[in-house]
From Swiss-Prot:
Function: Forms part of the ribosomal stalk, playing a central role in the interaction of the ribosome with GTP-bound translation factors.
Assembly: Part of the ribosomal stalk of the 50S ribosomal subunit. The N-terminus interacts with L11 and the large rRNA to form the base of the stalk. The C-terminus forms an elongated spine to which L12 dimers bind in a sequential fashion forming a multimeric L10(L12)X complex.
Originating gene: rplJ
Pfam entry (one): Ribosomal_L10
GO biological process, one term: translation
Protein name listed in UniProt: Large ribosomal subunit protein uL10
Length: 169
């Protein structure tokens, strides 16, 4: 990389750190080009980015954005995975890492909280924001459905009682 290109590369990484509340740092040593391509495609389909970075430039960008605590994570062949949706991103990376030993999850940051490998794997087990919203809507609708059922049962019971009384008389 030319010296004149380095400030542009740092600025690009700074923008990723600023715009993405979730970043996972990985080591990709041993991945083939086709494996990296398939990882990129899987991530891109879910609006998750993947960028191979030079460690020194990633550290400089981290310092520019106040993320000094993640600079120690950059050693070896590093790539960052970034997204606005941390759970889906973690799930994709963990699944790929589980099926391919050459991708190592080093750590990450979610909403300015440093995560280790274990925390990222636990994050991947959580339901996504979209799934949580669906569950909440379901929970909110359930009481209304039950109330309607009770009201309908009551009105039909009253109708049966009136009908039975009318038949008797």
């Amino acid at each position: 990389m030319l010296r004149s290109e380095k400030p542009v590369a740092v600025e690009d990484i700074v923008n990723i750190y600023k715009e993405s509340p979730s970043v996972i740092i990985t080591h990709y040593h041993g991945l083939t080009v086709s494996q990296v391509s398939s990882l990129r495609e899987a991530l891109k389909s879910k609006e998750v980015g993947f960028k191979v970075v030079k460690n020194t430039l990633a550290k400089i960008a981290a310092k520019h954005t106040g993320l000094d605590s993640i600079t120690d994570l950059f050693a070896g062949p590093s790539a960052i995975v970034y997204s606005k949706e941390p759970v889906e991103m973690a799930r994709l990376v963990v699944n790929f890492a589980n099926s391919n030993d050459n991708l190592k999850i080093i750590g990450g940051i979610v909403d300015n909280h440093i995560l280790d490998t274990y925390a990222i794997k636990e994050l991947a087990k959580l339901p996504s924001l979209h799934e949580l919203r669906g569950k909440i809507v379901g929970l909110l609708q359930a009481p209304a459905t039950k109330v309607v059922g009770v009201l309908q049962a009551t009105s039909s019971s009253i109708a049966r009682v009136i009908h039975a009384h009318a038949i008797k008389h």
